[in-house]
């Protein structure tokens, strides 16, 4: 345990000697004291002459916004009718047959209720 005490005494006495010195040889310039000529020579530079500028276009009116095309009326049907299909259609009047069908049903229902 005597050795541990000696180590503590050395650390407390020679704190200044043990600290690592800072490196003053590194010259880091402050951002406030930058030289503007150094920055121009080092990096890329955007051309600012009038030859390199985009010419101004003088329009008094802007063109209208593009519009969505209107759908065709015939495109709503799944099947397109050909002239042959249109010609072959024959109108049929089935109203009498429908009335007769419902009359028969009505009679059957009345008969089943009576029994």
Curated annotation (Swiss-Prot):
<dbReference type="GO" id="GO:0005634">
    <property type="term" value="C:nucleus"/>
</dbReference>
<comment type="subunit">
    <text>Interacts with CDKA-1 and D-type cyclins.</text>
</comment>
<feature type="compositionally biased region" description="Basic and acidic residues">
    <location>
        <begin position="17"/>
        <end position="36"/>
    </location>
</feature>
<keyword id="KW-0539">Nucleus</keyword>
<keyword id="KW-0649">Protein kinase inhibitor</keyword>
<dbReference type="InterPro" id="IPR040389">
    <property type="entry name" value="SMR"/>
</dbReference>
<keyword id="KW-0131">Cell cycle</keyword>
<feature type="region of interest" description="Disordered">
    <location>
        <begin position="17"/>
        <end position="82"/>
    </location>
</feature>
<protein>
    <recommendedName>
        <fullName>Cyclin-dependent protein kinase inhibitor SMR3</fullName>
    </recommendedName>
</protein>
<dbReference type="GO" id="GO:0032875">
    <property type="term" value="P:regulation of DNA endoreduplication"/>
</dbReference>
<dbReference type="GO" id="GO:0004860">
    <property type="term" value="F:protein kinase inhibitor activity"/>
</dbReference>
<feature type="compositionally biased region" description="Basic residues">
    <location>
        <begin position="67"/>
        <end position="81"/>
    </location>
</feature>
<comment type="function">
    <text>Probable cyclin-dependent protein kinase (CDK) inhibitor that functions as a repressor of mitosis in the endoreduplication cell cycle.</text>
</comment>
């Amino acid at each position: 345990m005597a050795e541990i005490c000696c180590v503590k005494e050395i650390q407390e006495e020679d704190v200044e000697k043990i600290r690592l010195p800072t490196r003053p040889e590194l010259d880091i310039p402050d951002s406030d004291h930058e030289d503007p000529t150094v920055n121009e020579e080092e990096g890329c530079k955007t051309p600012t002459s009038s030859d390199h500028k985009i010419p101004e276009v003088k329009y008094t009116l802007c063109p209208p916004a593009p519009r969505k095309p209107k759908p065709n009326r015939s495109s709503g049907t799944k099947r397109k009718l050909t002239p042959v299909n249109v010609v072959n259609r024959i109108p049929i009047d089935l109203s009498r047959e429908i009335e007769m069908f419902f009359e028969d049903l009505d009679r059957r229902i009345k008969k089943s209720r009576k029994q």
